[in-house]
Amino acid sequence: IEEKLKKAGFYYRVAYRVKAPDSMLDKLILKDYRRPGTENQDKKMQDLIGIRIILYYADDVEIVKNFLDTIFSMPGVWNTTEANEYEFRAMKINGIFKLPGYLSKTIVNPELGDYVDDTFEIQVRTNSFEGWHEIEHDMRYKGSAFGTGNEALARKMNSILATLELCDDSVVGLIEDLGHQHYKDRKWNYMLRCHYRLKFTREPLHPYIEEI
């Protein structure tokens, strides 16, 4: 994945993990996978392996999501949060992909085959939202720090999302403005870097372009 992202020129970081046995057991119990009569009775755990792609530019999120669908044998099954005008919510962009056969045989314990799927999860988010998600995951999803009696603080936690979204938009807008300034100054090399927001090599442009 990193090789493909690097070759395409994205600004990104990648984090990954494989669930530890105790973490895997906790989730199997919490989600009631395969337990008759529950909403997950026909489901398996799909994120034994988790990969997170952290992007520096917000408008790369959708591009990378579509890009990932092209580099594996099958497109991902995506779970995304739709934005609306009335509220700010954590934007979930998570994809489930099939593990290659040679990996699933070495990673997934056959004795857990009824409970753990031969898949992995990829999460895509921006650098601005990364820290918020980490705190929210530990305090709210894994614990109950924002439980009953802390509704006002939970709302305040969610309101931070609006600021982070503005920060993401501001960074993209600033680089676009910088590119426009370089265009007016006829600095084509810098203009192209700002316009596409990709990692180019340090080689100079073709002399024909430089002389325009």
What are these model-derived regions, one by one?
Residues D69-G76, G143:
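A common structural junction motif
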Residues E39-Q46, E111:
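Short, flexible, solvent-exposed loop/turn segments with mixed acidic/basic and small polar residues
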Residues Y56-D60:
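Helix N-cap motif at beta-to-alpha junctions
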Residues V116-I212:
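An acidic, glycine-/histidine-flanked metal-binding catalytic module
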Residues I1-R35:
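Surface-exposed, low-hydrophobicity interaction/linker segments
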Residues E62-V64, S104-T106, E130-H133:
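Short helix/loop capping segments that flank catalytic or ligand/cofactor-binding pockets
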Residues V64-I71, P110:
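Short amphipathic alpha-helices in soluble, non-transmembrane regions
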Residues V77-L99, L103-L112:
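Short Gly/Thr-rich strand-loop-strand
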